[in-house]
Design a protein with these regions (language model features):
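Residues that form generic nucleotide/phosphate-binding pockets
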Residues: 25
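Alpha/beta enzyme core
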Residues: 2-7, 11, 19, 28-38, ...
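Acidic, Ser/Thr/Pro-rich intrinsically disordered transcriptional activation regions
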Residues: 14, 21-22
Length: 241
């Protein structure tokens, strides 16, 4: 074979592709059920399985139905679950106080899941919008601004309540500046040093969130989220976030 006088043979990467066994041996990425995260939408009550029209195949589930669904997924090898609450309007207020209430059905469901499936990995959602009467991820001022600093202690209190309920991972999805440090400090000070933070580091002000907000009935009552979520036109900004 002509090698153009080079002291080495040309690369022949096809050697590692010539049969299924070799391809399997050299495969870098393998996807297994235990690597998947199953998002589940929960509501208060019993016997509820409410289909979500904008998310075909998904339903809002009450505690009993959700536990049954987790058992079905568990038997398929799925071990990681992320819970999202749909909160009734009468429980919402401007400071999202229901998010850390002892009567919060979301926290109760988390405790039930961990009691029945103690080896599962359970992930939460930390943001004000499911609990806020304004439908925003932060405190809304009288002139319509999102108050970043007033929001941070609320997120921290929410995160601690979720850790106490048994969540293994806290998932801040609010896009407030500085929230990770504040949440980490609050978790550590409350004895939850082992609770992880799995944050939404790059969340865009995108129409693609429409079906999700419909699932949780958490769309903003006024304005939009463009002052705290990222501009979809900016790619490199995600690295800074």
């Amino acid at each position: 074979m002509e090698t153009l006088g080079l002291p080495f043979q040309p690369s022949r990467p096809r050697r590692n592709r010539r049969n299924a066994a070799i391809r399997g041996l050299t495969r870098e990425t393998r996807l297994h059920p235990e690597q998947l995260i199953y998002p589940l939408f929960c509501v208060d009550g019993a016997g509820i399985e409410d289909p979500i029209g904008t998310l075909p195949g998904m339903s809002r589930l009450s505690e009993d139905k959700l536990l049954d669904e987790i058992e079905r997924a568990w038997n398929l090898g799925i071990r990681n679950f992320c819970l999202f609450p749909m909160v009734q309007d009468h429980l919402k207020d401007k400071t999202a106080s229901y998010s850390w209430s002892e009567d919060n059905f979301y926290l109760r469901i988390a405790r039930s899941v961990k009691a029945r499936f103690p080896e599962c990995s359970l992930m939460s959602d930390v943001a004000m919008d499911p609990y806020s009467s304004d439908g925003h991820d932060g405190v809304v001022t009288e002139d319509g601004r999102i108050d970043n600093e007033a929001t941070l202690p609320i997120l921290a209190r929410m995160a601690v309540a979720q850790a106490q309920a048994g969540f293994d991972w806290i998932g801040p999805s609010d896009m407030m500046d500085g929230r990770i440090g504040v949440i980490r400090e609050a978790l550590d000070e409350s004895g939850h040093q082992d609770t992880g933070i799995l944050a939404y580091t790059a969340k865009y002000a995108s129409a693609f969130y429409g079906p999700f907000r419909d699932a949780l009935d958490s769309a903003p009552k006024s304005g939009d989220k463009k002052t705290y979520q990222m501009d979809p036109a900016n790619v490199t900004e995600a690295l800074r976030e």
